[in-house]
């Protein structure tokens, strides 16, 4: 069942009920009630095995997050294992999943076409996971030094294309980006991601 439709979704012997999340003038609401998102970030990386984690290792990792009080996770900048999405469904951890368009460049036509393919593939593969609430369109797209050309106008134009494509593929969820404040008016959710004391500023 498409995630925009409320009702039961069955996978094997389990079922989950879908409820449409809302972001209205800032606060996040789920089932009509305001919910404070307490989250973390995840890359597919584990000591000794890298990204080749077993299902047991993935379950242990996600269970630990749940025990920490996490109810929201932003996945690393690439489509992750379906096992992780299923664990988030099971554990009640809401998900921001995103594509690997990073660091302020557009590349050529092939690069942009691949970004669009990755976005539609991610949505078509994972839209039936009730845990997913956000499709991420990029990461640190305001970073000027990793590509020979840094053109804010072109980045804004392509961000609009991805935003529209995401809503064409799934109109029940919101889009988001991290950083890139000159595109914050394009997406539905903007994360300034301050990282005080790391990228800028201080801890106090």
Segments and roles (model prediction):
Residues 146, 153-204:
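Extracellular glycoside hydrolase catalytic/binding regions
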Residues 1-4:
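Internal, hydrophobic beta-strand segments that form the core of beta-sheet-rich folds
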Residues 6-145, 160, 175-176:
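Active-site-adjacent substrate/metal-binding segments within catalytic domains
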Residues 54, 111, 115, 151, ...:
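Residue-level preference for long, well-ordered alpha-helices that form the structural scaffold
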């Amino acid at each position: 069942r498409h995630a925009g439709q409320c009702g039961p979704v069955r996978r094997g012997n389990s079922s989950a009920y879908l409820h449409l999340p809302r972001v209205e003038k800032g606060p996040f609401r789920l089932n009509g009630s305001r919910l404070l998102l307490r989250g973390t970030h995840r890359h597919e990386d584990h000591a000794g095995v890298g990204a080749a984690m077993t299902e047991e290792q993935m379950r242990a990792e996600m269970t630990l997050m749940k025990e920490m009080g996490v109810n929201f996770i932003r996945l690393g900048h690439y489509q992750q294992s379906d096992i992780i999405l299923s664990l988030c469904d099971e554990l009640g951890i809401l998900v921001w999943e995103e594509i690997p368009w990073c660091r302020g460049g557009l590349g050529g036509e092939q690069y942009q076409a691949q970004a669009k393919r990755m976005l539609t593939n991610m949505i078509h593969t994972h839209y039936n996971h009730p845990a997913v609430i956000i499709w991420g369109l990029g990461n640190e797209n305001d970073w000027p030094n990793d590509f020979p050309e840094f053109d804010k106008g072109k980045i804004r134009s392509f961000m609009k294309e991805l935003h529209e494509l995401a809503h064409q593929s799934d109109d029940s969820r919101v889009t988001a980006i991290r950083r890139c404040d000159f595109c914050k008016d394009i997406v539905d959710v903007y994360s300034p991601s301050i990282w005080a004391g790391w990228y800028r500023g201080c801890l106090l």
